[in-house]
Amino acid sequence: MEASAGLVAGSHNRNELVLIRGHEEPKPLRALSGQVCEICGDEVGRTVDGDLFVACNECGFPVCRPCYEYERREGTQNCPQCKTRYKRLKGSPRVPGDEDEEDIDDLEHEFNIDDEKQKQLQQDQDGMQNSHITEAMLHGKMSYGRGPDDGDGNSTPLPPIITGARSVPVSGEFPISNSHGHGEFSSSLHKRIHPYPVSEPGSAKWDEKKEVSWKERMDDWKSKQGIVAGGAPDPDDYDADVPLNDEARQPLSRKVSIASSKVNPYRMVIILRLVVLGFFLRYRILHPVPDAIPLWLTSIICEIWFAVSWILDQFPKWYPIDRETYLDRLSLRYEREGEPSLLSAVDLFVSTVDPLKEPPLVTANTVLSILAVDYPVDKVSCYVSDDGASMLTFESLSETAEFARKWVPFCKKFSIEPRAPEFYFSQKVDYLKDKVHPNFVQERRAMKREYEEFKVRINALVAKAQKVPAEGWIMKDGTPWPGNNTRDHPGMIQVFLGHSGGHDTEGNELPRLVYVSREKRPGFQHHKKAGAMNALIRVSAVLTNAPFMLNLDCDHYINNSKAIREAMCFLMDPQVGRKVCYVQFPQRFDGIDVHDRYANRNTVFFDINMKGLDGIQGPVYVGTGCVFRRQALYGYNPPKGPKRPKMVTCDCCPCFGRKKRKHGKDGLPEAVAADGGMDSDKEMLMSQMNFEKRFGQSAAFVTSTLMEEGGVPPSSSPAALLKEAIHVISCGYEDKTDWGLELGWIYGSITEDILTGFKMHCRGWRSVYCMPKRAAFKGSAPINLSDRLNQVLRWALGSVEIFFSRHSPLLYGYKNGNLKWLERFSYINTTIYPFTSLPLLAYCTLPAVCLLTGKFIMPPISTFASLFFIALFISIFATGILEMRWSGVSIEEWWRNEQFWVIGGVSAHLFAVVQGLLKVLAGIDTNFTVTSKATGDEDDEFAELYAFKWTTLLIPPTTLLILNIIGVVAGVSDAINNGSEAWGPLFGKLFFAFWVIVHLYPFLKGLMGRQNRTPTIVVIWSVLLASIFSLLWVRIDPFTIKARGPDVRQCGINC
């Protein structure tokens, strides 16, 4: 199927496959009405085959051969009418920039060699020129395209596919990957080349020339190595490329440890804080409060929990590291001049569900930044998963593909950053800086106008989608949209761009752009985002099968066009790359207010915690901005290092005499576990049935899983691949397989990212944290208080689900011992942190209770005991200061993180624990909603920040605020009434209460909104809570003056 052939929809279970023609039929070439050249006025002429000479196959603009060749040699090399780059035609010489066209069998004209010289070269047995040309042609053509042996999509029509409804002929070629690697399977996809021999093979002349060529190469190698007979190599014969080769052999990345002057004091303070914490808890346990045992016991339980939580969070940050990448070495190693790029291919996944909550313009910018990435276009394929089967998403993607033909060449011509047009044109910087091209300003202005028109078209589609027709959506050709019922529709695939038709305005190829919507039927579990990502894994394996995959949320665009190259510096490094399962990039965000009121940037986690994990076994997977190794997602174990010598032991102890297992934990043979692939000898040990039970019943997909270096399986026709692609996204494909259990994104939690990374680390893989100077990806964050709390609620609920699942880090993964202990601490902390909301809520209530009752959580302390409290506070602040020192996090970002830890802990985390317990104990499932992505407001950039949206998550923090404020008023009033003696004990209680209020201050500002006016709903809640505590106040009666007089028992007065 060609890129413009149309939408393919089908269901494997129902044996249906239909081809729906797109919105517009392919435009025919312009009719050649005349035979006069529009440039010089001469006749156009004919080709050597007698056909009319056509210079441009796109528009058919009449140009004669001399003008055509002159324009290619001296001019712009573009058609004067449609501006498409002229391709080399048979009989014309090659010019710089031409691609390798395999269907042109025209060597003498291609290299501008006349017949006499060709004959002379054939008769000259010492002339090696033609031999080198033949060799160059052989290597060049073996690196590109598909030959006629594999089928030519433009000439060989495919047989019609019979469906349950109708028979539709499917013709054309599906744009399959040419070579996604350099493994043994890749070569079988290339065109079979018949070189042009200078003489008949097998003759003496051929053998003699081959021997001469071999001798010359051997002598050249010896001279470079300095072993030529007669002494050392001549300095004049020194090869200038040797230093470049030495540089290319260097590591592509290196680990940079934090300076010891920064990290050693930090570790010392951690140890001191641990010691002080032990003495502090010992003192608190041994000194109860007799008249306030419930308050004392509650505070002790909370403080012990906080201590355990701090240990789990702190010690995974013991080995923080930085990393450096060397992009120039990557290019020297895999991108040599004059040779095809050897960089591995990458499949990029973009997931979206609801276009009304995830605006199509946001998704379009993400897709445009992918298509314009700085990476070989034949190595990039973009798959967009539309899990809502929305026609709006489909149409907007079609518009995006058309706009990409203009946007991509503009980005690459002027090397602009970022390559998402919305954010490029909105950035407030000097766009003329470092731009010396004379036409830049003019073309930038024109491109901005083109983008504004593109936005108008997208917004028109969005406006049209607001009113759904009663009969459902109808495509422009009159066909009903297959996804009108979002819960019951066939699988759909549409290729918008690709090698068979995806060219930009300058005639250069564009990366593939594929629309995918998996099949959904009632009664089948779809597993939300994790299921959609697994469907993308399978369909990409069938169509392109790149060895690496990058997944992005629809609102995360590529901010650094070299981001993929940064990841390849780790994944393709010969020394350490084979054990790396994924490269995680930090999340950076646009559109956040300057003070980051609700800690949206999450800098403490991304710049401190993740750096610490990188020094252990690698960072956790955070759901987006991550480049995966495909083999790791298939459940394979990492390659093993050199085996140690076997230890000679007796069989007296069962642990020493165990029989070696034939299969690993995941049921993989040792050949797979050790090498990531299958040995030819051991391949027969695992039957096809076992593979299908693991990966599913698709022969094409199962074959692709055995290809570690990627590439499309050999002998695959476009029709078969198309049918398999529909098959692997069918709703019942995963039944009775390991998908979601051991393969791909793991099911069982709405935070599938944590589970997926955890499974990989348990198998022994390690991950890498990459922080380039320019942020690799940027996204949008919910700056509204209610949206932010709902987002945190979803994360916390996912952690609770993992804690109660069979993959809980407390119990899972001990058998193989591949997960390091500090890494396990981090995963345990990731799953239990929502439970901290219970002690945190109790601890934040204690100050108000103490102020209202006149009691406290600890007895009066001595001077010596006060040293424990002073030392504890100093160690807490010292740890934070030293963390900020080695990480570069500002004090404002650190403080915002502390504040939102309390805000989220007493609201979203608390609700997550309750919902998680209801789901586990009562089976009540809670559906999460997709966080809305804002498109921006031209009138006020932060209008969403001040918008008030009521949610039940606001009730607990509001109650805490009012309770502590009432407590402060009551405590001060009591001290005023009872004299100066009450101020001493009151100071500790007030400090405790103000600690809670200060941490909840951003929440209070969020309630006040822009006008500093409390909303009505909050006023009602405040009055209600105030009434309740007023009744409590009357019961306590703190304002009654307590009489201080003689004891009646002593004076004998009968009162």
From Swiss-Prot:
This is Cellulose synthase A catalytic subunit 9 [UDP-forming]. Its cofactor is Mn(2+); Zn(2+). Zn(2+) 1 binds at residues 37, 40, 64, 67. Disruption phenotype: Plants develop a brittle culm (bc) phenotype with a reduction of up to 90% percent of cellulose content in culm. CDD domains: mRING-HC-C4C4_CesA (cd16617). Its EC number is 2.4.1.12. The active site is at 387, 753. A zinc finger (RING-type) spans 37-83. UDP-alpha-D-glucose binds at residues 351, 357-358, 387, 528. It comes from Oryza sativa subsp. japonica. It is an enzyme of class 2 (transferase). It catalyses: [(1->4)-beta-D-glucosyl](n) + UDP-alpha-D-glucose = [(1->4)-beta-D-glucosyl](n+1) + UDP + H(+). PANTHER family: X-BOX TRANSCRIPTION FACTOR-RELATED (PTHR13301). PROSITE patterns: ZF_RING_2.
